[in-house]
Amino acid sequence: MRNRTYTADAEPGDTVTVAGWVHEVRDLGGIAFLILRDTSGKIQVKFEKDEMDDDLVETGLGVHRESVISVTGEVDEEPRAPTGVEVTPESLDVIAEAEAQLPLDPSGKVDAELSTRLDNRTLDLRKDEVKAIFEIRAEVQRAVRDKFRDLRATEINTPKIVATGTEGGTELFPITYFGQEAFMNQSPQLFKQLMVGSGLERVFEVGPIFRAEEHNTPRHLNEATSIDFESAFIDHTEAMDVCEAVVTAAYEAVEENCQDELEALGLEEEFERRPRVPAAHLRGGHRAHQRTGELDEQLVWGDDLPTEGEKALGEDVGEHYFITDWPSEIKPFYIKDHDDDETLSTGFDMMHPNMELVSGGQREHRFDHLVAGFEQQGLDPDAFEYYTKMFKYGMPPHAGFGLGGERLIMTMLGLENIREAVLFPRDRQRLSP
């Protein structure tokens, strides 16, 4: 529609054509109102029955909610209208009529279960508060990309179909690839490292990852967005500095540019009090264990921290924090050990009080040590020859991390289920839409 005006741009005295969805119709007798909604907001359309063509009034008042219409008319100032202006229609065209009975109420007046919402995601996204989540998600991705570019990182796109898993194990989706066995990539980790060795030195990626894990919880997905960073000539402490800077940039961008969306979610005041920059570094996974209260008796050095332990630590610390110096035996083969203590790795996790957000560390850049790491974890180095051979050609020291995109949005906005942060989530039960 060449001459269409967004509702937010309609000014008193203008003659405009606005188009969008019928949000609400109210018939008050001699006068009636239709609320039209587009991506920029809403506008009131006024029908004065005694002064308007009967067919125009009948069309406007008879159209079903969520039908797509266009309205041409003059914009008048009206302080009592939801946005302070209203349109007196000269014409109204029904572009696409919606059914009278909808599977859920986009106005939000009638609650729906999450499963119903996800089954009808297109309708669900017409709610202001749901749309706001994805406007914020888009702003977060813009902000992290800008921050990485400020740090002189180059954006890359790595393969999502691979011959071997990044970390081995069973969390892989196998596919048939022209008669060969292949998998959906569970992480861009190995390719990030190859790009560091290529001379690009500092790279990042915002892209999908696939994990065939059995967890089916409010914070797990089988397809997720990973925000990845890798850089030459830095160690794990400098990678943590970058991690802090990126998460902080995301929060600051949302606070600065998404006030309308935060208001739609009821977070305009609460958001400012949410934790943002890591305030505590728990040096040594064993010292993290010591702060888990009654659970400490159940934890054994070398074990990963269970969900209950994460929650106990979150309650104790109260804001974002790092756990560092994890036991080497529970970290992947590419994580470098400390030079002065091979039982401790340079791996780190960045935690929100409610869950893990980031996993990272310094990488093993020495070929012999890398191959030994494969063997210690029962992996065949020959299966990763495309990766390991680069370490014979001059690989610089490097470090990096992967940040869960949906988990960042979930914790930032206080969402109860990670699926609310995904347009069309994929989990163990959901493959459609």
Curated annotation (Swiss-Prot):
Which Gene Ontology cellular-component terms appear in the entry? aminoacyl-tRNA synthetase multienzyme complex; cytosol
Residues making up the signal peptide according to the UniProt record: none
Identify the EC number(s): 6.1.1.23
Q: Which GO terms describe its biological process?
A: aspartyl-tRNA aminoacylation
How the cofactor is bound: the record states:
Binds 3 Mg(2+) cations per subunit. The strongest magnesium site (Mg1) is bound to the beta- and gamma-phosphates of ATP and four water molecules complete its coordination sphere.
Q: What CDD domains does the record tag this protein with?
A: AsxRS_core, ND_PkAspRS_like_N
Cofactor needs? Mg(2+)
Pfam families from the entry? tRNA-synt_2, tRNA_anti-codon
| Residues engaged in binding ATP | R211, A212, E213, R219, H220, L221, E356, G404, G405, E406, R407
Gene Ontology molecular functions? aspartate-tRNA ligase activity; aspartate-tRNA(Asn) ligase activity; ATP binding; magnesium ion binding; RNA binding
Q: Which reaction does it catalyse?
A: tRNA(Asx) + L-aspartate + ATP = L-aspartyl-tRNA(Asx) + AMP + diphosphate
For binding L-aspartate, which residues are annotated in this chain's numbering?
A: E167, R211, S359, R363
Where on this chain does Mg(2+) 2 bind?
E356, S359
User: Membrane-spanning residues where?
Assistant: none
Binding residues for Mg(2+) 3: E356
Q: What is its main location?
A: cytoplasm
Where along the sequence does the record put site: Important for tRNA non-discrimination?
A: P82
- Give the UniProt keywords, A-Z: Aminoacyl-tRNA synthetase, ATP-binding, Cytoplasm, Ligase, Magnesium, Metal-binding, Nucleotide-binding, Protein biosynthesis
Q: Where does this polypeptide localize?
A: Cytoplasm
Q: Where is this region: Aspartate?
A: 189-192
EC class, as a word, reads ligase
UniProt record similarity statement = Belongs to the class-II aminoacyl-tRNA synthetase family. Type 2 subfamily.
Subunit architecture: Homodimer.
Q: Any idea what job this protein has? A: Aspartyl-tRNA synthetase with relaxed tRNA specificity since it is able to aspartylate not only its cognate tRNA(Asp) but also tRNA(Asn). Reaction proceeds in two steps: L-aspartate is first activated by ATP to form Asp-AMP and then transferred to the acceptor end of tRNA(Asp/Asn).
What is this protein's name?
Aspartate--tRNA(Asp/Asn) ligase
Instruction: Supply the source organism for this entry.
Output: Haloferax volcanii
